[in-house]
Amino acid sequence: MKILVSGFDPFGGETVNPAYEAVKLLPDTIAGAQIIKLQVPTRFALSGTVLEAAVNEHRPDAVICVGQAGGRSAITPERVAINLADASIPDNAGDQPVDEPIRKDGAPAYFTSLPVKAMVQKMRAAGIPAALSYTAGSFVCNSLMYTLLYLIDRQYPAMRGGFIHVPYAMEQAGNKPLGTPSMELHQIARGLALAVEAVVENERDLTVNR
């Protein structure tokens, strides 16, 4: 099995992005699956293009995109991406779309095809804070997840894909308001590795209450 894992570059004035920093810490093989690591730009117009090129090149069995969700206290696999770009801040190219569709010919929303409940269960069993999320927002993270699932729907129906949001890394919390949630980078990476294991072990998601 081959799994592509992507993470974003820093944005919003940050000097690091825990998404790609954690992805870089992943081993090259997890549970027998080959791990391909990819950095994507935090740019509406370019992130999907970079990811699509990597998908076309490597033809992975599954794709896990990872992004930062500052303010969250747990690792949160996303269930759904919506066809909406509505940015509260500019991306790294200065683009700030308002109420724009990501794909004019796309569905209103796409659901993840990753075993997100199994991911959460596996991380929690290891003592890592994790929870399902039902909103990927409307910034570049949601845009990338939507673009991936659109690509899978149109071209790669056997491929599985989705998105995971991670908290701030601890080194980012120093200049944030007191009490801002953060997580140690190695713990984030451990959580992502367990999420990958869940993908390898579960062709379909668990049927359990969240």
Q: Locations of the language-model features?
A:
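Short, solvent-exposed polar/charged micro-motifs at secondary-structure junctions
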Residues: S47-T49, N142-S143, A173
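N-terminal catalytic or cofactor-binding beta/alpha core of small enzyme domains
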Residues: M1-A136, L149-A158, T180-G191, V196-R210
